[in-house]
Amino acid sequence: MNSELFTLTYGALVTQLCKDYENDDDVNKQLDKMGYNIGVRLIEDFLARSNVGRCHDFRETADVIAKIAFKMYLGITPSITNWSPGGDEFSLILENNPLVDFVELPDNHSTLIYSNLLCGVLRGALEMVQMAVDVKFVQDTLKGDSVTEIRMKFIRRIEDNLPAGEE
Amino acid sequence: MAVCIAVIAKENYPLYIRSVPTENELKFHYTVHTSLDVVDEKISAMGKALVDQRELYLGLLYPTEDYKVYGYVTNSKVKFVMVVDSSNTALRDNEIRSMFRKLHNSYTDIMCNPFYNPGDRIHSRAFDTMVNSMMMQVC
Protein backbone atom coordinates (compact mmCIF):
# COMPACT_ATOMS: atom_id res chain seq x y z
CA MET A 1 0.00 0.00 0.00
CA ASN A 2 1.13 3.51 -0.80
CA SER A 3 2.50 5.14 2.32
CA GLU A 4 1.17 8.63 1.55
CA LEU A 5 -2.34 7.27 1.24
CA PHE A 6 -1.94 5.54 4.58
CA THR A 7 -0.57 8.65 6.28
CA LEU A 8 -3.25 10.89 4.82
CA THR A 9 -6.00 8.45 5.78
CA TYR A 10 -4.83 8.41 9.36
CA GLY A 11 -4.51 12.20 9.30
CA ALA A 12 -8.06 12.58 8.04
CA LEU A 13 -9.26 10.30 10.82
CA VAL A 14 -7.53 12.27 13.55
CA THR A 15 -8.61 15.68 12.26
CA GLN A 16 -12.19 14.48 11.97
CA LEU A 17 -12.05 13.34 15.57
CA CYS A 18 -10.66 16.73 16.54
CA LYS A 19 -13.68 18.34 14.88
CA ASP A 20 -16.12 15.96 16.53
CA TYR A 21 -14.79 16.22 20.07
CA GLU A 22 -14.20 19.42 21.90
CA ASN A 23 -11.07 18.65 23.83
CA ASP A 24 -7.94 16.72 23.08
CA ASP A 25 -8.36 14.30 25.97
CA ASP A 26 -11.55 12.95 24.45
CA VAL A 27 -9.81 12.56 21.10
CA ASN A 28 -6.94 10.69 22.78
CA LYS A 29 -9.41 8.37 24.47
CA GLN A 30 -11.29 7.78 21.26
CA LEU A 31 -8.09 6.99 19.36
CA ASP A 32 -7.10 4.54 22.06
CA LYS A 33 -10.49 2.87 21.87
CA MET A 34 -10.34 2.56 18.11
CA GLY A 35 -6.84 1.19 18.39
CA TYR A 36 -8.03 -1.35 20.94
CA ASN A 37 -10.71 -2.56 18.55
CA ILE A 38 -8.10 -2.86 15.81
CA GLY A 39 -5.70 -4.68 18.14
CA VAL A 40 -8.11 -7.40 19.20
CA ARG A 41 -8.69 -8.25 15.56
CA LEU A 42 -5.16 -7.68 14.31
CA ILE A 43 -3.65 -10.18 16.74
CA GLU A 44 -5.47 -13.02 14.99
CA ASP A 45 -4.07 -11.96 11.67
CA PHE A 46 -0.66 -11.53 13.19
CA LEU A 47 -0.57 -14.98 14.78
CA ALA A 48 -1.79 -16.60 11.61
CA ARG A 49 0.74 -14.89 9.39
CA SER A 50 3.82 -14.79 11.58
CA ASN A 51 3.84 -18.30 13.05
CA VAL A 52 5.27 -17.17 16.34
CA GLY A 53 4.60 -19.36 19.30
CA ARG A 54 3.87 -18.49 22.87
CA CYS A 55 6.35 -16.13 24.48
CA HIS A 56 8.06 -17.31 27.64
CA ASP A 57 8.72 -13.95 29.15
CA PHE A 58 8.05 -10.30 28.61
CA ARG A 59 11.42 -9.75 26.97
CA GLU A 60 10.52 -12.18 24.25
CA THR A 61 7.20 -10.42 23.81
CA ALA A 62 9.02 -7.11 23.40
CA ASP A 63 11.21 -8.63 20.70
CA VAL A 64 8.27 -10.04 18.82
CA ILE A 65 6.44 -6.71 18.93
CA ALA A 66 9.39 -4.66 17.77
CA LYS A 67 11.02 -6.98 15.25
CA ILE A 68 8.06 -8.78 13.77
CA ALA A 69 4.82 -6.92 14.43
CA PHE A 70 6.02 -3.36 13.76
CA LYS A 71 7.98 -4.57 10.77
CA MET A 72 4.97 -6.37 9.36
CA TYR A 73 2.40 -3.63 9.75
CA LEU A 74 4.31 -0.35 9.71
CA GLY A 75 7.54 -1.31 8.00
CA ILE A 76 9.71 0.01 10.80
CA THR A 77 11.74 -1.68 13.51
CA PRO A 78 11.72 0.24 16.76
CA SER A 79 14.52 -0.38 19.22
CA ILE A 80 13.88 -1.71 22.70
CA THR A 81 15.53 0.10 25.58
CA ASN A 82 15.15 1.29 29.14
CA TRP A 83 14.19 -1.99 30.74
CA SER A 84 13.09 -1.54 34.30
CA PRO A 85 15.12 -3.57 36.82
CA GLY A 86 12.16 -5.89 37.35
CA GLY A 87 11.93 -6.61 33.63
CA ASP A 88 8.28 -5.65 33.48
CA GLU A 89 8.60 -2.34 31.71
CA PHE A 90 10.38 -1.19 28.56
CA SER A 91 10.42 1.50 25.93
CA LEU A 92 10.00 1.22 22.19
CA ILE A 93 11.98 3.93 20.43
CA LEU A 94 10.65 4.87 17.00
CA GLU A 95 13.19 6.71 14.93
CA ASN A 96 10.58 7.65 12.43
CA ASN A 97 6.88 7.20 12.75
CA PRO A 98 5.09 6.69 9.44
CA LEU A 99 1.86 8.05 10.92
CA VAL A 100 3.26 11.56 11.32
CA ASP A 101 5.11 12.04 8.03
CA PHE A 102 3.62 15.43 7.09
CA VAL A 103 2.06 16.41 10.36
CA GLU A 104 2.71 19.61 12.26
CA LEU A 105 0.63 19.97 15.39
CA PRO A 106 -1.13 23.32 15.55
CA ASP A 107 -0.71 25.28 18.78
CA ASN A 108 -4.28 24.74 19.89
CA HIS A 109 -3.81 20.97 20.01
CA SER A 110 -0.83 20.83 22.31
CA THR A 111 -2.20 17.98 24.42
CA LEU A 112 -3.27 15.82 21.51
CA ILE A 113 -1.46 12.48 21.36
CA TYR A 114 -1.58 12.15 17.62
CA SER A 115 -0.49 8.52 17.36
CA ASN A 116 -2.40 7.28 20.37
CA LEU A 117 -4.04 4.68 18.16
CA LEU A 118 -0.84 2.65 18.39
CA CYS A 119 -1.19 2.39 22.17
CA GLY A 120 -4.68 1.03 21.78
CA VAL A 121 -3.55 -1.48 19.19
CA LEU A 122 -0.77 -2.82 21.42
CA ARG A 123 -3.04 -2.99 24.45
CA GLY A 124 -5.82 -4.72 22.55
CA ALA A 125 -3.54 -7.22 20.86
CA LEU A 126 -1.73 -8.23 24.05
CA GLU A 127 -4.98 -8.52 25.95
CA MET A 128 -6.06 -11.23 23.53
CA VAL A 129 -2.95 -13.22 24.40
CA GLN A 130 -3.64 -12.96 28.12
CA MET A 131 -1.45 -10.02 28.93
CA ALA A 132 -2.71 -6.85 30.51
CA VAL A 133 -0.36 -4.02 29.70
CA ASP A 134 -0.27 -0.30 30.11
CA VAL A 135 0.91 1.55 27.03
CA LYS A 136 1.59 5.23 26.70
CA PHE A 137 3.60 7.78 24.77
CA VAL A 138 6.33 9.44 26.80
CA GLN A 139 8.12 11.24 23.97
CA ASP A 140 6.83 12.36 20.62
CA THR A 141 8.66 13.94 17.70
CA LEU A 142 5.56 16.03 17.05
CA LYS A 143 6.08 17.74 20.37
CA GLY A 144 9.69 18.57 19.66
CA ASP A 145 11.38 15.48 21.12
CA SER A 146 14.10 13.92 19.05
CA VAL A 147 12.52 10.46 18.99
CA THR A 148 9.15 8.91 19.63
CA GLU A 149 9.05 6.69 22.68
CA ILE A 150 6.28 4.32 23.66
CA ARG A 151 6.44 2.99 27.21
CA MET A 152 4.96 -0.45 27.86
CA LYS A 153 4.33 -1.78 31.33
CA PHE A 154 3.30 -5.32 32.08
CA ILE A 155 0.51 -5.40 34.63
CA ARG A 156 -0.60 -9.00 35.00
CA ARG A 157 -1.50 -12.18 33.20
CA ILE A 158 -5.16 -12.57 32.48
CA GLU A 159 -6.13 -16.04 33.58
CA ASP A 160 -9.80 -15.75 34.42
CA ASN A 161 -11.10 -17.07 31.13
CA LEU A 162 -9.79 -20.61 31.56
CA PRO A 163 -12.74 -22.97 31.88
CA ALA A 164 -12.91 -24.61 35.27
CA GLY A 165 -11.46 -28.09 35.52
CA GLU A 166 -8.95 -27.73 32.75
CA GLU A 167 -5.24 -27.98 33.54
CA MET B 1 19.42 34.65 -1.96
CA ALA B 2 15.89 35.91 -2.28
CA VAL B 3 14.61 39.06 -0.63
CA CYS B 4 10.95 38.13 -0.82
CA ILE B 5 9.08 34.86 -1.30
CA ALA B 6 5.35 34.60 -1.82
CA VAL B 7 2.84 31.83 -2.37
CA ILE B 8 -0.34 32.88 -4.13
CA ALA B 9 -3.50 30.83 -4.28
CA LYS B 10 -5.33 29.88 -7.43
CA GLU B 11 -7.76 32.77 -6.89
CA ASN B 12 -4.86 35.21 -6.60
CA TYR B 13 -4.94 35.91 -2.90
CA PRO B 14 -1.78 35.46 -0.86
CA LEU B 15 -1.27 32.25 1.11
CA TYR B 16 2.12 33.22 2.32
CA ILE B 17 4.36 36.21 1.89
CA ARG B 18 7.61 36.88 3.58
CA SER B 19 10.39 39.35 2.93
CA VAL B 20 13.67 40.27 4.52
CA PRO B 21 12.85 42.31 7.59
CA THR B 22 15.26 45.12 6.83
CA GLU B 23 13.35 46.35 3.84
CA ASN B 24 10.01 47.98 3.36
CA GLU B 25 7.56 45.13 3.41
CA LEU B 26 4.76 46.94 1.62
CA LYS B 27 6.95 47.56 -1.38
CA PHE B 28 7.37 43.83 -1.86
CA HIS B 29 3.65 43.28 -1.53
CA TYR B 30 3.18 45.68 -4.44
CA THR B 31 5.93 44.06 -6.45
CA VAL B 32 4.42 40.62 -5.99
CA HIS B 33 0.95 41.92 -6.74
CA THR B 34 2.12 43.48 -9.98
CA SER B 35 3.91 40.33 -11.01
CA LEU B 36 0.64 38.38 -10.98
CA ASP B 37 -0.47 40.14 -14.14
CA VAL B 38 2.71 39.06 -15.85
CA VAL B 39 2.11 35.50 -14.70
CA ASP B 40 -1.38 35.53 -16.17
CA GLU B 41 -0.07 37.02 -19.34
CA LYS B 42 2.60 34.39 -19.69
CA ILE B 43 0.13 31.59 -19.21
CA SER B 44 -2.48 32.96 -21.55
CA ALA B 45 0.13 33.74 -24.18
CA MET B 46 0.73 30.04 -24.53
CA GLY B 47 -1.72 28.10 -26.63
CA LYS B 48 -4.27 25.82 -25.00
CA ALA B 49 -2.34 22.73 -25.93
CA LEU B 50 0.90 24.12 -24.65
CA VAL B 51 -0.55 24.94 -21.26
CA ASP B 52 -1.02 21.26 -20.58
CA GLN B 53 2.59 20.37 -21.12
CA ARG B 54 4.30 23.59 -20.23
CA GLU B 55 7.11 23.88 -17.77
CA LEU B 56 6.12 24.97 -14.29
CA TYR B 57 8.97 27.43 -14.10
CA LEU B 58 8.08 30.68 -15.87
CA GLY B 59 11.49 32.29 -15.71
CA LEU B 60 12.14 35.96 -15.19
CA LEU B 61 8.82 37.82 -15.02
CA TYR B 62 10.26 41.30 -15.10
CA PRO B 63 13.30 43.16 -13.88
CA THR B 64 13.10 46.45 -12.03
CA GLU B 65 15.93 48.73 -11.18
CA ASP B 66 16.76 46.96 -7.94
CA TYR B 67 15.12 43.58 -8.21
CA LYS B 68 14.39 40.68 -10.47
CA VAL B 69 11.10 38.87 -10.13
CA TYR B 70 10.79 35.18 -10.95
CA GLY B 71 7.65 33.08 -11.19
CA TYR B 72 6.56 29.46 -10.97
CA VAL B 73 3.05 28.10 -11.40
CA THR B 74 1.98 24.62 -10.38
CA ASN B 75 -0.51 22.63 -12.38
CA SER B 76 -3.10 23.46 -9.72
CA LYS B 77 -2.52 27.16 -10.54
CA VAL B 78 -0.80 27.95 -7.27
CA LYS B 79 1.83 30.58 -7.92
CA PHE B 80 5.20 31.03 -6.33
CA VAL B 81 6.88 34.38 -6.76
CA MET B 82 10.43 35.12 -5.76
CA VAL B 83 12.05 38.56 -5.68
CA VAL B 84 15.82 38.62 -5.98
CA ASP B 85 18.24 41.49 -5.63
CA SER B 86 19.55 42.42 -9.10
CA SER B 87 22.99 43.12 -7.77
CA ASN B 88 23.22 39.42 -7.06
CA THR B 89 24.48 38.35 -10.47
CA ALA B 90 25.92 35.10 -9.24
CA LEU B 91 22.48 33.57 -9.17
CA ARG B 92 21.97 31.38 -12.21
CA ASP B 93 18.72 30.38 -13.78
CA ASN B 94 19.37 26.82 -12.71
CA GLU B 95 19.66 27.75 -9.07
CA ILE B 96 16.44 29.73 -9.18
CA ARG B 97 14.82 26.71 -10.74
CA SER B 98 16.02 24.41 -7.99
CA MET B 99 14.92 26.89 -5.34
CA PHE B 100 11.44 26.85 -6.81
CA ARG B 101 11.50 23.08 -6.87
CA LYS B 102 12.38 23.10 -3.17
CA LEU B 103 9.61 25.54 -2.48
CA HIS B 104 7.16 23.38 -4.38
CA ASN B 105 8.15 20.25 -2.44
CA SER B 106 7.79 22.08 0.82
CA TYR B 107 4.39 23.36 -0.21
CA THR B 108 3.34 19.81 -1.08
CA ASP B 109 4.29 18.68 2.42
CA ILE B 110 2.14 21.40 3.92
CA MET B 111 -0.81 20.37 1.81
CA CYS B 112 -0.37 16.86 3.18
CA ASN B 113 -0.53 18.05 6.77
CA PRO B 114 -3.97 16.96 7.98
CA PHE B 115 -4.28 20.04 10.16
CA TYR B 116 -3.89 22.41 7.23
CA ASN B 117 -7.06 23.38 5.40
CA PRO B 118 -6.40 24.08 1.74
CA GLY B 119 -6.89 27.76 1.03
CA ASP B 120 -5.89 28.96 4.48
CA ARG B 121 -2.87 31.10 5.11
CA ILE B 122 0.21 29.02 5.70
CA HIS B 123 1.42 28.90 9.29
CA SER B 124 4.08 26.28 9.42
CA ARG B 125 7.37 26.14 11.21
CA ALA B 126 8.87 23.81 8.64
CA PHE B 127 7.92 26.12 5.80
CA ASP B 128 9.25 29.16 7.68
CA THR B 129 12.59 27.47 8.22
CA MET B 130 12.83 26.50 4.58
CA VAL B 131 11.98 30.01 3.37
CA ASN B 132 14.39 31.53 5.85
CA SER B 133 17.18 29.33 4.58
CA MET B 134 16.52 30.59 1.07
CA MET B 135 16.64 34.21 2.14
CA MET B 136 19.65 33.84 4.40
CA GLN B 137 22.12 32.71 1.79
CA VAL B 138 22.45 36.21 0.32
CA CYS B 139 23.60 38.07 3.34
UniProtKB/Swiss-Prot annotation, chain B:
Subcellular location: Cytoplasm, Perinuclear region; Endoplasmic reticulum; Golgi apparatus
One biological process term in Gene Ontology: endoplasmic reticulum to Golgi vesicle-mediated transport
Disulfide bonds: none
Keywords associated with the record: Cytoplasm, Endoplasmic reticulum, ER-Golgi transport, Golgi apparatus, Transport
Any Gene Ontology CC annotation: perinuclear region of cytoplasm
Signal peptide extent: none
InterPro entries, per the entry: Longin-like_dom_sf, Sedlin, TRAPPC2L
Pfam families hit by this protein: Sedlin_N (PF04628)
Stated family: Belongs to the TRAPP small subunits family. Sedlin subfamily.
Known role: May play a role in vesicular transport from endoplasmic reticulum to Golgi.
Listed name of the protein: Trafficking protein particle complex subunit 2-like protein
